[in-house]
Amino acid sequence: MFIKRKLKETEIKDFTLNFGPQHPAAHGVLRLILELNGETIKNADPHIGLLHRGTEKLIENRNYLQALPYFDRLDYVSMMVQEHAYSLAVERLYGINIPQRAQWIRVLFSEITRILNHLLAIGCHSMDVGAMTPLLWGFEEREKLMEFYERVSGARMHASYIRPGGVAQDLPSGFVEDVYSFILDFSVRLDEIEELLTNNRIWKQRLVNVGIVTAKQAIQNGFSGVLLRSTGIPWDLRRSQPYEIYDKVPFRIPVGTRGDCYDRYLIRMQEMRQSLRIMMACLKYLPGGSIKSDDKKFVPPLRWEMKNSMESVIHHFKYFTEGFKVPAGQTYAAVEAPKGEMGVFLISDGSNQPFRCKIKAPGFFHLQNLPEMTKHHMIADVVTIIGTQDIVFGEVDR
């Protein structure tokens, strides 16, 4: 009798739910084990590694040029920015400076990549929350940007355009004019997206005061990029530790006040506007001259040289098969990627292959704080929080 009464009075509310890895809002292969009390989250345990490919080890068995395409495939939404980080690391180890024109072109494409990333982030996030139109508009604009990729590299995504020593090839005829036209048109499209979302009552109810991160938490967890700036800390490597020609272009660093999902959305919208300013400056001040270093051992020979010189043909063959040797040493190069600080720690033993290449991906640090960000929120808020973290598992798992 006693046992029956005990069972009758006991009510079990807590249960465990698997979120992903096949969930459309998981942004890849994220598996979350959620401990729920009704619809309230008590704990979220992220399981990663489902996209692990051993990238860092693969790079150690390739020469410095052959390692470059692996960086396109880490965060496969922010391709050229990662090429940029790797190229800077190799150039610092080698002790070489690249021409001004190549630096301006690199910055131009870094900002094109930033817009590519943020359009996808906001579009997919809005789709997860329930707004469909921004995703369709965003993909329409991304097509135009991918066409710019295609015109300089032949590829829409994995470009391998920013290379150690400069860039692969010069801008084609009419390219500057087309980018200028895009900047003018895209400003209007940004206004339209903001008109749909920024003051939308449902959008704000889903984002405001959801997934709050304090400045102290952000620093303790190694946050960078939009998630760090949403807490009110104006840390941007383009301004804090300028590389290439970022100290010569005017732009502002948008920061948040609450550190919630809505702040992160607003910052991404403002960052796209600042990217347009930087792109306009690149078009205005783009100098003439060479797009590659003049160090013949570090860059391949030009096409016209190979048509006139057998030595150039031999050099071309050896360059792409054996690569170049980099002096022994170590360096760390970081760039402000759309998701945060993308860093490459490179150790050379004096051979033509990296002895060690450690990649610092911002998404890995952001994801480790997901349990704290989701605690005591509703299960529907998990989608909102993951969306504003802007996670891509190519860089998290590597």
From Swiss-Prot:
Lineage of source species: Eukaryota, Sar, Stramenopiles, Bigyra, Opalozoa
Enzyme class, UniProt record, top EC level: translocase
EC number, as in UniProt: 7.1.1.2
Species assigned in the record: Cafeteria roenbergensis
Keywords: Electron transport, Mitochondrion, NAD, Oxidoreductase, Respiratory chain, Translocase, Transport, Ubiquinone
Cellular component GO terms, alphabetical: mitochondrion
Annotated signal sequence range: none
KW Electron transport (keyword) present: yes
Annotated family: Belongs to the complex I 49 kDa subunit family.
Name of protein: NADH-ubiquinone oxidoreductase 49 kDa subunit
PROSITE patterns documented for this protein: COMPLEX1_49K
Classification via InterPro entries: NADH_Q_OxRdtase_suD, NADH_UbQ_OxRdtase_49kDa_CS, NDH1_su_D/H, NiFe-Hase_large
GO biological process, one term: mitochondrial electron transport, NADH to ubiquinone
The organism's place on the tree of life at top rank: Eukaryota
Subcellular location as annotated: Mitochondrion
GO molecular function: NAD binding; NADH dehydrogenase (ubiquinone) activity; quinone binding
Gene3D superfamilies reported for this sequence: Cytochrome-c3 Hydrogenase, chain B
Chaperone as UniProt keyword: no
Functional description taken from the UniProt entry: Core subunit of the mitochondrial membrane respiratory chain NADH dehydrogenase (Complex I) that is believed to belong to the minimal assembly required for catalysis. Complex I functions in the transfer of electrons from NADH to the respiratory chain. The immediate electron acceptor for the enzyme is believed to be ubiquinone. Component of the iron-sulfur (IP) fragment of the enzyme. Component of the iron-sulfur (IP) fragment of the enzyme.
A Pfam family of this chain: Complex1_49kDa
Catalysed reactions, as listed in the record: a ubiquinone + NADH + 5 H(+)(in) = a ubiquinol + NAD(+) + 4 H(+)(out)
